[in-house]
UniProtKB/Swiss-Prot annotation:
Species annotation: Arabidopsis thaliana (Mouse-ear cress)
Lineage: Eukaryota, Viridiplantae, Streptophyta, Embryophyta, Tracheophyta
Transit peptide: 1-53
Protein name stated in the entry: ATP-dependent zinc metalloprotease FTSH 4, mitochondrial
GO MF, one annotated term: metalloendopeptidase activity
Keywords recorded for this protein, A-Z: ATP-binding, Hydrolase, Membrane, Metal-binding, Metalloprotease, Mitochondrion, Mitochondrion inner membrane, Nucleotide-binding, Protease, Transit peptide, Transmembrane, Transmembrane helix, Zinc
Record's subunit section: Homooligomer. The complex formed by FTSH4 does not contain FTSH11.
Misc remark: In contrast to fungi and metazoa, plant mitochondria have more than one i-AAA-like complexes.
Length: 717
């Protein structure tokens, strides 16, 4: 038997036997003891109980127990010498106290070998399970995995020989800091490796993923001509020489002349800057590259500079050509040391490309921006964008031409007078006028009309300038009456004040955020505003508040005049601090919005005093006018309550029909303006209200007569 050979080998090698004993004891003692019947963990197995006694009693008990074990081991050896292995087996298995004794275990194994029952003994299976558990517990420290085959014969029938030794590995205990540092290094190396692979993949996939080479394609079919661009004749004249250069470059280069490399179009939004660039390409018949400043940057660093290089590289292959960059301030803003490096890279690449290609390559760079002051100085210097062309809002004639261009695409009625619409739309850009025509066409289509009429254009203009009507808003009669007198006060002061803008329309229909509105439009385009016009605007702003006080009393004034007071205060402060229209402050400009840093306390108080004086004077002027023309105020308010909306022409007809000596009243206004009336007290307001009530009947009768006489005074939608 294999176990018999093991015992023989162990007997000849006492040193190996001692190691095996310690191993077997550890493995065997970690499991329940073998009972008399050979069952593990049976009822016959019991562990020695540890009693917590004094140190003296404990040491005495241990000495007694050790002496008994020595005697029992000696008895087992005696039985072996007597050749009675069965008695040794019975004694060992019946006494659990011997299971932890190495000498007793050795005698027990000898007895099993003699009776040839070692392979069938419960001890073998218990040792195999115990050694496997110990090996799992000690694997971290080089454990006992080599002893998992205990009880199984090897090639030579023994656990190990000189030719087939049992290999064991012993490792030193590692410290926590070393283990942590090793983990961090592993994670760091992995992160760097993944980042490098990702960067390599992105770098190779940027061109395909973002489609740089596919996007840089010129537009060869630009059908826009200079004749399609209206209202910017001066800008077109400056761009014509670029067209001639693109058509015949040798005409300019033969004398050594050099055209600008870059043209910067500056102006408000919607004035036709992009259309001008397309017209250049259409007139010259050359390829046209179009892009936006925001298209260069992406989430990847360096993409902007690469796109700039690809754009100019494609342009060089198609020269002569035009590159148009819209909203160039997105990449051409002034550089700041705090900006990100990738933002500077794009601008630097743009600067190099603008000043890097040869002069005669036939590439014209046209850019557009609404904020030329925000561009970097290196970008707009001579040699790059060295020509600036201003594209302003069109004047009256330009607006008429633009309206004609857009109206040629819709069905127009015979009563349409585009010059009237052009005069009534100061400050409108080409895009605003195109929107006006489109809104009018949609209105005519909704109404089922065959063509676009003048009323449709007026509706579109009022909707853009005054906001959409809110006819469904529920407003009380008291609020409508107060709004009518408020707007009537504005209109009357504007009519009877020299220098005020003509009244275009008055309405008490809510539009936008306002309950009512008086619209004023100039007869012609204004390039500057005089002091008389500004003072007239202050008077008109005060007209609504004064009308409320005269009709309803100071205790009944509302918050409806808050916007008027805000506009008047801003205008009066600008007159004092910006326009030098105050004798006390002088011809000095002050920055009033810097919390007083640019002025002393005395100067600030002086400015406030001058502003208050201007507003009080405007208040007195408005009060004088409305007191004199109180009858007209009632008539106008009643007409607004009846028709809700009146045009400037209808208001003038209403006032003309009133039986009043206008020349005499104007003379009285001039006389009373020389002696301003102070702000009224509640008693004076009451008397004014009484006087107004006395004239109410006559005014109402006159308004009714005028409404009957002029049937054309229908509400203007």
């Amino acid at each position: 038997m294999a176990w018999r050979r093991i015992i023989t080998k162990v007997s000849s090698h006492e040193r190996e036997l001692s190691s095996l004993r310690s191993l077997l004891v550890r493995a065997y003692s970690s499991f329940p003891r073998v009972g008399v019947t050979g069952a593990v963990g049976g009822g016959g197995a019991s562990l020695p109980r540890t009693r917590f006694q004094s140190s003296y009693v404990g040491s005495f008990a241990r000495r007694v127990r050790d002496r008994e074990e020595v005697n029992e081991v000696a008895h087992l050896r005696e039985l072996i010498r007597r050749n009675d292995p069965e008695a040794v087996i019975r004694m060992f298995e019946s006494q659990p106290s011997l299971h932890a004794n190495a000498s007793a275990l050795s005698e027990y194994i000898k007895a099993l070998v003699k009776v040839d029952r070692l392979d069938q003994s419960e001890l073998v299976r218990t040792l195999q399970r115990g050694i496997a558990g110990v090996a799992r517990e000690e694997e971290t420290f080089g454990g006992l995995g080599a002893f998992r085959n205990v009880g199984k014969p090897t090639k030579d029938g023994v656990l190990g020989t000189a030719s087939a030794p049992i290999h064991t590995i012993s490792t030193e205990r590692t410290h926590f800091k070393e283990q942590l540092w090793s983990t961090i290094r592993t994670i760091g190396v992995g992160f760097l490796l993944i980042s490098g692979i990702g960067a390599l993949i992105e770098d190779r996939g940027i061109g395909k993923g973002l489609g740089l080479h596919e996007e840089v394609q010129p537009s060869m079919d630009s059908s826009t001509k200079f004749s399609d661009v209206k209202g910017v004749d001066e800008a077109k004249a400056e761009l014509e020489e670029i067209v001639h250069y693109l058509r015949d470059p040798k005409r300019f280069t033969r004398l050594g002349g050099k055209l600008p490399k870059g043209v910067l179009l500056v102006g408000p939004p919607g004035t036709g800057k992009t259309m001008l660039a397309r017209a250049i390409a259409g007139e010259a018949g050359v390829p046209f590259f179009s892009c936006s400043g925001s298209e260069f940057e992406e989430m990847f660093v360096g993409v902007g500079a690469r796109r700039v290089r690809d754009l100019f590289s494609a342009a060089k292959k198609c020269s002569p050509c035009i590159i148009f960059i819209d909203e160039i301030d997105a990449i051409g803003g002034s550089r700041n040391p705090k900006d990100q490096q990738y933002m500077k890279m794009t601008l630097n690449q743009m600067l190099v490309e603008l000043d890097g290609f040869k002069q005669n390559e036939g590439i014209i760079v046209v850019a557009a921006t609404n904020f030329p002051e925000s561009l970097d100085k290196a970008l707009v210097r001579p040699g790059r964008f060295d020509r600036h062309i201003v594209v302003p809002n069109p004047d009256v004639e330009g607006r008429r031409q633009i309206l004609e261009s857009h109206m040629s695409k819709v069905l127009k009625a015979e009563d349409v007078d585009l010059m009237i619409i052009a005069r009534g739309t100061p400050g409108f850009s080409g895009a605003d006028l195109a929107n006006l025509v489109n809104v009018a066409a949609l209105k005519a289509a909704m109404d089922g009309s065959k063509d676009v009429t003048m009323s449709d254009l007026e509706f579109a203009k009022d909707r853009i300038m005054m906001g959409s009507e809110r006819k469904s808003a529920v407003i009380s009669d008291e609020s409508r009456k107060l709004t009518a007198f408020h707007e009537g006060g504005h209109a009357l002061v504007a009519i009877h004040t020299e220098g005020a803008l003509p009244v275009h329309k008055a309405t008490i229909v809510p539009r936008g955020m306002a309950l009512g509105m008086v619209s004023q439009l100039p007869d012609k385009d204004e390039t500057s505003i005089s002091r008389k016009q500004m003072l007239a605007r202050l008077d008109v702003c005060m007209g609504g508040r004064v009308a409320e006080e005269l009709i309803f009393g100071e205790s009944e004034v509302t918050s409806g005049a808050s916007s008027d007071l805000e506009q008047a205060t801003k205008l009066a402060r600008a007159m004092v601090t910006k326009f030098g229209m105050s004798k006390e402050v002088g011809l000095v400009a002050h920055n009033y919005d810097d919390n007083g840093k640019s002025m002393s306390t005395e100067t600030r108080l002086l400015i406030e005093s001058e502003v208050k004086q201007l507003l009080e004077k405007a208040y007195n002027n408005a009060k004088t006018i409305l007191t004199v023309y109180n009858k007209e105020l009632h008539a106008l308010a009643n007409a607004l309550l009846q028709h809700e909306t009146l045009s400037g022409k209808q208001i003038k007809e209403l006032l003309t029909d009133l039986n009043s000596p206008l020349l005499q009243k104007r003379q009285e206004v001039v006389t009373k303006q020389s002696n301003p009336v102070p702000p009224s007290t509640p008693s004076s307001a009451s008397s004014a209200a009484a006087a107004a009530a006395a004239a109410a009947a006559a005014a109402a009768a006159a308004a009714a007569t005028a409404a009957t006489k002029g049937k054309d005074m229908a509400p203007v939608s």
